[in-house]
Amino acid sequence: MVDINQIPTRRPFHRRRKTCPFSGANAPKIDYKDVRLLQRYISERGKIVPSRITAVSQKKQRELAKAIKRARFLGLLPYVVR
């Protein structure tokens, strides 16, 4: 019979949490006119990339989404990329 205490247990895998790229001392400001910065947070299809992928905090993700939508409305960013 196998003793449960003799079976080696795996150590739990802890993924290191990424920090928000917009928080910190020299972090860039989110501005709707900064098209190059906003394009990094848009997929190749033109959709806003979720914060679980980009590691942006919830507050900054809302600011980012608002800036992207504002830039789209003004014609600085495309709505859809084909």
Swiss-Prot record:
Q: Which PROSITE patterns match?
A: RIBOSOMAL_S18
Q: How does it assemble?
A: Part of the 30S ribosomal subunit. Forms a tight heterodimer with protein bS6.
Q: What does the record give as the function of this protein?
A: Binds as a heterodimer with protein bS6 to the central domain of the 16S rRNA, where it helps stabilize the platform of the 30S subunit.
Keywords for this protein: Ribonucleoprotein, Ribosomal protein, RNA-binding, rRNA-binding
Disordered as annotated region, ranges: 1-20
What the record says about family reads: Belongs to the bacterial ribosomal protein bS18 family.
SUPFAM superfamilies from the xrefs?
Ribosomal protein S18
Query: What is an annotated GO biological process for this record, any one?
Result: translation
Q: What is this protein called?
A: Small ribosomal subunit protein bS18
GO MF annotations for this entry? Answer: small ribosomal subunit rRNA binding; structural constituent of ribosome
Gene Ontology CC entries for this record = cytosolic small ribosomal subunit
Gene3D superfamilies in alphabetical order: Ribosomal protein S18
Species for this entry: Mesorhizobium japonicum (strain LMG 29417 / CECT 9101 / MAFF 303099) (Mesorhizobium loti (strain MAFF 303099))
Please give one Pfam family short name: Ribosomal_S18
